[in-house]
């Protein structure tokens, strides 16, 4: 696991208040980790801050799972 993957999983666990063991690459923020729409907005903001990037609203809507976040961050950093 790359350091980006690990850091994203740590942020997801922290933001959503779940155990890191639940944060798998396939985990959907809403379906598997219990996030609501506000949680996902806050999660995107935390990722923007951590990786010093700006995620457009259009792109943010496409980030639905841990793997989506990893792919986006990897492609944009």
Swiss-Prot record:
UniProt keyword annotation of Glycoprotein present: no
Primary location group: cytoplasm
GO cellular component: cytosol; membrane
Residues modified as O-(pantetheine 4'-phosphoryl)serine: 37
Keywords from the UniProt entry: Cytoplasm, Fatty acid biosynthesis, Fatty acid metabolism, Lipid biosynthesis, Lipid metabolism, Phosphopantetheine, Phosphoprotein
Ranges annotated as spanning the membrane: none
Signal peptide feature range: none
Subcellular locations according to the entry: Cytoplasm
Domain Carrier: 2-77
Pathway named in the protein's UniProt entry: Lipid metabolism; fatty acid biosynthesis
Name of the protein described by the UniProt record: Acyl carrier protein
């Amino acid at each position: 696991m790359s350091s980006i993957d690990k850091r994203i999983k740590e942020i997801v666990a922290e933001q959503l208040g779940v155990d890191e063991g639940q944060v798998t690459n396939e985990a959907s923020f809403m379906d598997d980790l219990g996030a609501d729409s506000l949680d996902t907005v806050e999660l995107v903001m935390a990722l923007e801050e951590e990786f010093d990037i700006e995620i457009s609203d259009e792109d943010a809507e496409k980030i639905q799972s841990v793997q989506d976040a990893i792919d986006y961050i990897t492609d944009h950093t």
